[in-house]
């Protein structure tokens, strides 16, 4: 019995070490040739220009994309907390990739596959920043590995506040709108500072972003 246990322990240890080796090998292989994440420091998005009449009505809007940049200090906590709750509950605890979130999503997706439900993602907000700014939307393991590597690097170089600012100004929220400031005008015809909890529930639900 003891001999069998020792043999099993050796197999498990060998498998664990092999897995660690493969992970480090993949990170080393995909680390070369990645986009320069440092350019995020000088991010200047193309924003919309709006023309209003004397009575305050919108006359015209000129833009390639519906987008209004707003500093993180001007985004109310109710908006920030709604996105954190919906997208990345462990944002302030993880280093770019959330191991607990990945494990939880894997278990949940096994249930979803059995029940024929929609699969859940496990990308952190930092990973989404890496994808939206530096990578493509290609669905592949290669892209996910690059996304994870960039997420680690972004977390080392930028504050959580800056990462949130980038995310909340870049996220696509449907109807051609990018960022929370532009979407608040599109959906509610009011400033992002005027949004309440019920507004944010619509903001963070999948439906406004179905057209991604």
Give each language-model segment a name:
Residues 118-181, 194:
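Amphipathic, coiled-coil-like alpha-helical scaffolding segments used for oligomerization/assembly
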Residues 21, 56, 83, 129, ...:
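Residue-level preference for non-acidic, small/hydrophobic
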Residues 1-52, 90-91:
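N-terminal type II signal-anchor transmembrane helix
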Residues 71-125, 178-183, 188, 193-195:
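Flexible, acidic/glycine-enriched loop-and-adjacent beta/alpha segments
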Residues 54-57, 64-67, 75-78, 86-89, ...:
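Solvent-exposed coil/turn segments that connect beta secondary-structure elements
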Residues 45-47, 66-68, 79-82, 98-101, ...:
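Envelope-exposed proteins and targeting segments
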Residues 203-212:
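Single conserved hydrophobic/aromatic residue that forms the stacking wall/gate
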Residues 30-80:
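Terminal hydrophobic membrane-targeting helix
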């Amino acid at each position: 019995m003891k001999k069998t246990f020792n043999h099993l322990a050796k197999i498990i240890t060998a498998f664990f070490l092999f897995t660690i080796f493969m992970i480090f090998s993949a990170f080393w292989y995909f680390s070369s040739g990645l986009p320069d994440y440092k350019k995020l420091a000088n991010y200047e998005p193309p924003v919309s220009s709006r023309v209003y009449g004397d009575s305050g009505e919108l006359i015209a809007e000129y833009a390639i994309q519906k987008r209004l940049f707003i500093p993180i200090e001007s985004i109310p906590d109710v908006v920030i907390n709604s996105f954190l709750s919906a997208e990345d509950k462990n944002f302030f605890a993880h280093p770019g990739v959330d191991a607990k979130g990945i494990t939880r999503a894997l278990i949940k997706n096994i249930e979803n596959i059995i029940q024929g439900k929609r699969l859940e993602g496990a990308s952190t907000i930092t990973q989404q920043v890496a994808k939206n700014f530096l990578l493509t939307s290609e669905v592949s393991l290669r892209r996910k590995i690059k996304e994870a590597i960039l997420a680690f690097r972004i977390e080392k170089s930028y504050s959580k506040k800056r990462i949130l600012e980038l995310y909340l100004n870049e996220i696509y929220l449907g109807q051609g709108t990018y960022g929370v400031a532009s979407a608040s005008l599109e959906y509610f015809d009011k400033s992002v500072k005027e949004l309440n909890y019920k507004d944010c529930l619509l903001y963070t639900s999948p439906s406004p972003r179905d057209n991604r």
